[in-house]
């Protein structure tokens, strides 16, 4: 029994060490061109604190700005998650139907985080409400 516990702990330590080594600091110039253009267009006035390439299961990239905002990109340089800690997500990024829904239903709130994948887009408002939309930008879930 003792050998099994030691083996399990050893495997856990190795797995943790291996995955920790998959994050690699990079320069912004090493991001895919699509990501570089996106940052320049929507976040050009912000200073980058760090950029890293993650190679866990799928290659991805993360940028953190000195003001606390973060952007995650997929391997092609398309954004997957934008988290603006102290400001609104730039309106040009938000799909028009989602921006309209939020403006119509929550006029006093702003979108501070947006996350998308192949099936849905989820936004978080500054009042902590989360709204999930399907591919056609219809509301499918809300979390208060």
Model feature map: region roles:
Residues 21-144:
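Interaction-mediating elements
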